[in-house]
């Protein structure tokens, strides 16, 4: 249960309003994005699965067992469609409630992240500018050496490598220096962000407008209700699978009986 609640919390704490999965203009809710991705995946699985089932049924073994897998597969597909129709509204309600209850927390964290981004952006821009300047200087130094390689013979290759190696080492040292500088400059902001997030979570833990304990209790309650509503639908799935299993079992037993008769004849 904790893993489920933590996963849902991570999803909603991002607070992103990405574009629609199919690039429509209006942003989707978290539930709509998950539902669309799941539908695309399930449709692909259904199509590929039906193709494999059809191939198995058309094989010599399938004909001998008289499995009728395609009919059973279609029946199973209808059963899963009923599952989707029954559980879809319940799951959507759960997502919407959790998203609403974490809205304030996500807003505050996004605000803190944006503040840190604005403060650190000048450092990042400066590092990028210096890095590009070093790359350009490196290119200008290496270009004449590359021309020498094209114009010279193979015996100059070792000499060229000796000339290029120090330049590569200089570039590597520059990158390390920039990384160390950037790490030093960003360290205070990283510590500040860590403390801010810790304070946010501690305030919620101590019993703010919406505590983590309340989120856990509400999520547990919603998941329990979802489980109760899913029981009859899961029973339908079980009933849908039984004909396929019985058909397969009967076919296998018939093949065994025929083989036994041939051996004793």
Curated annotation (Swiss-Prot):
Residues 67-265 are annotated as: 10 X approximate tandem repeats. Keywords: Cholesterol metabolism, Glycoprotein, HDL, Lipid metabolism, Lipid transport, Lipoprotein, Oxidation, Palmitate, Phosphoprotein, Repeat, Secreted, Signal, Steroid metabolism, Sterol metabolism, Transport. Glycosylated. It is found in: Secreted. It comes from the Eukaryota. SUPFAM superfamilies: Apolipoprotein A-I. One of its GO terms (cellular component) is chylomicron. It holds the Pfam family Apolipoprotein. Gene3D superfamilies: 1.20.5.20, 6.10.140.380, Apolipoprotein. The modification Methionine sulfoxide is found at residues 193, 242, 244. Its main location: secreted. GO terms for molecular function: cholesterol transfer activity; phosphatidylcholine-sterol O-acyltransferase activator activity; phospholipid binding; protein homodimerization activity. Residues 1-18 form the signal peptide. Sequence repeats lie at residues 67-88, 89-110, 111-121, 122-143, 144-165, 166-187, 188-209, 210-231, 232-242, 243-265. Major protein of plasma HDL, also found in chylomicrons. GO terms for biological process: acylglycerol homeostasis; cholesterol efflux; cholesterol metabolic process; lipoprotein metabolic process; phospholipid efflux; positive regulation of cholesterol efflux; positive regulation of phagocytosis; positive regulation of phospholipid efflux. Homodimer. Interacts with APOA1BP and CLU. Component of a sperm activating protein complex (SPAP), consisting of APOA1, an immunoglobulin heavy chain, an immunoglobulin light chain and albumin. Interacts with NDRG1. Interacts with SCGB3A2. Interacts with NAXE and YJEFN3. Belongs to the apolipoprotein A1/A4/E family. Participates in the reverse transport of cholesterol from tissues to the liver for excretion by promoting cholesterol efflux from tissues and by acting as a cofactor for the lecithin cholesterol acyltransferase (LCAT). As part of the SPAP complex, activates spermatozoa motility. This is Apolipoprotein A-I. The gene is APOA1.
